Amino acid sequence: MASTVAGNSFVSQQHPGNLHSANLQSQSQGFRRQNSTSSVPSTASFDPPNGSIANTGSQKHHPMSSQQSQPPASQQSFSMSQTGSQPQPSQSSFRSYSDQNVPQQPQEASPIYTAVYSNVEVYEFEVNGVAVMKRIGDSKLNATQILKVAGVEKGKRTKILEKEIQTGEHEKVQGGYGKYQGTWIKYERALEVCRQYGVEELLRPLLEYNRNPDGSVSQANLNTPTKEQAMAAQRKKMYNSGADSRNNNGGGTFFKNISQTAHSAMTAISKARFDSPGPRGRNGPTRAPSFQRQLSTQSIDDFHGGNSQASNFAENFPPQDVNMAFSAGSEPQPGGLNGTEPPRKRQRMDMTPANSFGAYANNSQMQAYADAFPGSPTEPNDSFIYTQHAAANDTLLQQQHDQQTPLQPLPYEQSVEAENKRSMLMSIFMNDGMSEQARVDTLRQIHPRDLDMPIDSQCHTALHWAATLSRMTILRRLIEAGASPFRVNTSGETPLMRACIVTNSHDNDSMPAILDILGNTMEVRDSKERTVLHHIALTSAVSGRSAASRYYLQCLLGWVVRQGAANGGQLNSQTFNGGATVSQSQNATRLDLGRFMSEMLNAQDSAGDTALNIAARIGNRSIISQLLEVCASPHIANRSGLRPTDFGIGVDSDGAMKTKGDSGGDVENGDVGGSSQKSNESSNEIVTSITHLLTETSANFQEEIKNKQKNIDSLHATLRLTTTDVNDLRRKLDEAQARVKAQQLARQKVTNLQRAEERERYRLTQLEQTTGRRDIASANGWEAESNTLLATINATTNGEPDADAKLPSSALLRARIEAVKKQTESTRQSVVALKGRSREVEGRYRHLVALATKCRDEDVDSTMEGLLKAVESEKGELEIGRVRRFLGGVEGVIG
C-alpha cells in the first residue's frame, strides 16, 4: 500500500527481511539540501468585522526559480562514510547525544537500501556523504552522483557532463525529486566513468549488487531494506553503542539541561511506558514486534531500550517460529499486498503481539506472550513484519490519513443562496448581543458542508474567524456543528495557524483551549510547507508580538507534553482484539513529544528554513532558547546554505559548537565529532565564496565601465558631427529667412503700386465721364492755333494789313471761351475738393504723430522739424508693410 508524503514525490518501500542492523554505522547525518535564499515573507491577514487583525509583515520573498517540495524530517536521508574516509560530524536533531556520548568506532560500509523517487525504484548507496543511485528496472546510474563521489567540483562537473557524458546516450532528469535529478547513463557507460575517475572500488558494492556472475541482472532482492528500515536500525545501533556510557541521572534521558516542559514530557512518556501491564524482567521478552513506521512515528523511548528486540525474540522462540514469522511477509496479503507490488510506507499503527503475528497467534507460546505483554505505543519497536491484520486495517488507516490532510478551500460562490448563508455566518461574529441559543439555532440551519464555505476574499472560513478572534464559544459550536478544522484558506493556512499570527489568543489567554480543539491540525503545512512553528517564528518578528509568540510556543509545547502523557495512559489499557476502532486509531496517531521532535521540530519549508533558522535570522532570543531546549538542530541549512550556526546560534564566543552537558552549563565541543572544525570549514567556505563573488563582481564592473566609456566616446563624436550639421542648417535657415523677407517686401511694393494704379485709373475714368474724352493731339493743335492768333493780333496792331479775314468766327470764339471757362471751373472745383481731402488727412496724420510723440495736436507743427530729422536719420528703406500695419491699427483709434 502506497502512502505519498506531503510535499514531495518520495515514496519508500518496505520489504520484509533481515536488516543486518549490526553492520550499520552509528553516526546519523541529516539530509542537507541545496536551497535558494529565503526571506521572511509577508503573512497576509484579514480584517473581520468585529475584531482587529493586523498584518504580520510586509517583506516580500523573492521567487525561486524552481520550487521543489522537501521531504519531512522523517524522510531525510542519512550519511555514512566509507571505510577509511574522514568521519562526518552529526547533523541530526540529536546532536548533543551523538557527538558527545557515542564512542568512536571503526567506520563500516554503508548499507544498500531501496527507495522510490518520482515513482522510480532505485537502489541507494551512500559514499563520502553522497547518495549514489542505481535504477532497479534498467540498472542505469546517475553520472552526476558518480562525479560527486570522485570529488569533481561543480564547474568542472558540468563541463565533463556536457563534453563527455551527454554526447552519448543518456537521460537527463531535471524535474521531480531533487536527489533524483541528474544525467542517467547505462550500466556499461557508468562502469567506464567509475574506472576513469577512480571510484570503481568505492562504488563496487552498488555496481555488483543484484547482478549475476555472468553480468546479467537478477530479480529484485526482497531482503534489501528500505531507507526507513536502515535508518531505524542505524539509530538503534547508535543508541546501543552508547548506552553503557550514558549518564542515567536526572530525567532519565540523554537530553541534558532541558527546560521544565521538555523534562515533564520525558517523565510523562517514561511513566506511561513503565506503567503498562506485564512483567519487565531483564531476561524475559520485552514485547512482540508490531507494525509501526520506524522513522516518522518512533517515540523518544526508542532511544531508551536495551538490547535489540529482534535478538530477544530469537532467544525466546524456536527457530521454526521465527522463520514462519519472517516468511509471512512474502505471502500475498489482503488489500493489494502481493509479491509483485511490495507494501509501501503505511500509516502508523500500534497493535498487540497477537495482531502483530497474525495467523501465528494460535501458537500457544505466541498467544501466551501476547497475553502477557500487550502493545504499548511508547516502547521501542524494531520489527518490520507485515501481518494480515495490518492489511485488513488499511482502509481505516487511509481514512485517518485523510483526516490529517489539509482540505482545499471551497469555491467562493456569488449566488443569492450563498450570500444568505455567508450573512448568517457573519451575523454570529457581528452581533455581540446574540444569545447562545440563537447561535446554535443559526448553525443548525446551515448544512455542515456549508460551514466550510469561504466568507471573505481570502477564503477564510467561519472557523478561521473564530480562531483568529479567539471566540471560544463560537469555535466549539462550529466544531460541534461539523466544521472541519482541516479546511485551509488560499494560502493553505489552518485556523490554528491564523490564531498564532495575531495576538487575540494571547490577550484572552485562550491558546490552551484552542489547542485542545484544533491541536490535531498541528502537523498540517501551508502552501509554502510551513508548520505552526514557522508561523510562530515569523510572527515574532512583528513589533509588539514577540511576547505573544513566546506564549504560543510555550502553550504548544505544553500541549504536546499533555497529549503524550494522555495517550500513553489510554493506550496501555486498550487492546485491538483483531481490529481497531476509529477513536483508538486516532489516539494511536496523536502527536506526542517524540513525533513532534522527530517530525515537526526540524521541519523545513519550501525555502529550506526550519523554525529555528527563521528565529535565528530574526534574532528573537526567547523563541531561539525555547527551540534549543527541545533540541532543535542549529545545523540544518536552507536552500541558500545558511544555518542557525551562521547567526551565532549554538556557537560560543570562540566560534566552537556548544552542546548540553551533565552539569547544566554549556561546554565546548570543539574536539568532539569535529564540530568546531566543521564550523571553521563552513566559515572559511563562506569567506572564500564572498571573496570570489566580490572579485568576480569587481571584474564585471570594470568591464562594464570600459564598455560604457566606449559608448560615451562614440556618443561625443556623434554629438560633435551633429552640432556642425546643426550650425550649417541654422545658417542656411537664416539666409532663407532673409530671402523670404525680401520677397515679401517686393510683393508688398508691387501690391501698393497696383493699388495706386487702380486708384488713378478710377479717377481718370471719373474725369472722362465728367468732361468728356479729350484728344491730346487736338489739344496741342488748339494751343498752336492760339499762339498763331495772338501773333496775328500783335502784327495788326503794329500797322500790318487787316487780318480779320483770318480770325475764326465769333461763334467759334465764344464756344472756345465757354469751354475754357468750364474747364477753369472744373479745375477750381477739383482744387477745392483736394484741399478738403488734404485737410482731413492732415488732421488724421497730425493726431497720429501726436499719439506717437505723446504730445498735443497743436504742438505737432512745432516739433515737425525734429521729427523730420529723426526720420531722415534712419538708414535703409522703411518697411512699408510695417507702416501700413501700424497705420491700420491706428485708424480705429483715430476714427
Swiss-Prot record:
Chain segments annotated as coiled-coil in the UniProt record: 698-759
Annotated Gene Ontology cellular component terms: MBF transcription complex; SBF transcription complex
Composition skew (Polar residues), residue ranges: 1-45, 674-684
UniProt-listed InterPro entries: Ankyrin_rpt (IPR002110), Ankyrin_rpt-contain_sf (IPR036770), HTH_APSES_sf (IPR036887), KilA/APSES_HTH (IPR018004), SWI6-like (IPR051642), Tscrpt_reg_HTH_APSES-type (IPR003163)
Keywords: ANK repeat, Coiled coil, Conidiation, Nucleus, Repeat, Sporulation, Transcription, Transcription regulation, Virulence
Main localization, broad class: nucleus
Localisation per UniProt entry: Nucleus
GO molecular function: DNA binding; DNA-binding transcription activator activity, RNA polymerase II-specific; transcription coactivator activity
Ranges: ANK repeats: 458-488, 607-636
Deletion consequences: Leads to deformed and non-melanized appressoria that are unable to penetrate plant surface due to the impaired cell wall integrity. Shows abnormal hyphae as a result of altered chitin synthesis. Leads to sensitivity to H(2)O(2).
DNA-binding region: 143-164
Residue intervals of the HTH APSES-type domain: 112-219
Region (Disordered): 1-107, 272-293, 323-358, 653-684
Gene Ontology BP annotations: conidium formation; sporulation resulting in formation of a cellular spore
Pfam assignment, any one: KilA-N
Biased composition (Low complexity): 64-100
Biological role: Transcription factor that plays a role downstream of the MCK1-MKK2-MPS1 cascade. Required for hyphal morphogenesis and pathogenicity. Is an important oxidative stress response regulator and plays a positive role in the regulation of extracellular peroxidases.
Protein's name according to its UniProt entry: Transcription factor SWI6
Gene designation: SWI6
